[in-house]
From Swiss-Prot:
It comes from the Bacteria. Belongs to the UPF0260 family. This is UPF0260 protein Spea_2441. InterPro entries: Puta_zinc/iron-chelating_dom (IPR005358), UCP006173 (IPR008228).
Length: 146
């Protein structure tokens, strides 16, 4: 039985917790909230540290030094991070759902995740190159595939 099936999120050690992250990069996308409806919108504007080709952070260990607003996902704040996509392993497990078939912990690589269209790799623009972020609202980050 896999550790994510045996343990609660709170019981996981640091290595297990970190391995739950599939590296999709969706959490690194700029998000907008409509002032009137409070609806959340994802954009294809990515954090300046996101590697567009690989779809992951170029400076993960030092990211808070460069981007102080970067959010560290923890067991203590997970429930309040309602902007995490439905495909996020942390969110899925919190909701009592399984890891999807494409998750790197199940497949051994990120290839299935990329083939399932779950990675931001090749789909984003660096936030520093965008003028009007409202023109960059996209729906694909909300996609969730079992």
């Amino acid at each position: 039985m896999a550790f994510w099936d045996e343990k609660t999120l709170a019981q996981m050690n640091t290595e297990e917790w970190e391995s739950l992250c599939d590296g999709c990069g969706k959490c690194c996308l700029n998000k907008l909230i409509d002032d009137e409806t409070e609806e959340l919108y994802y954009t294809n504007a990515a954090c300046q540290l996101l590697d567009n080709k690989a779809g992951h952070c170029k400076s993960y260990e030092q990211r808070f030094n460069f981007v102080p607003s970067c959010t560290k996902v923890t067991v203590d704040n997970l429930e309040s991070l309602t902007w995490l996509p439905d495909s996020c392993a942390y969110r899925r497990l919190l909701q009592g759902r399984e890891l999807p078939s494409w998750h790197p912990l199940r497949t051994g690589s990120k290839e299935a995740m990329i083939l399932a269209g779950m990675s931001v790799a090749g789909k984003v623009t660096c936030e520093t190159k965008i003028r009007d972020i409202e023109d960059h609202i996209v729906l694909w980050p909300m996609k969730d595939v079992e």
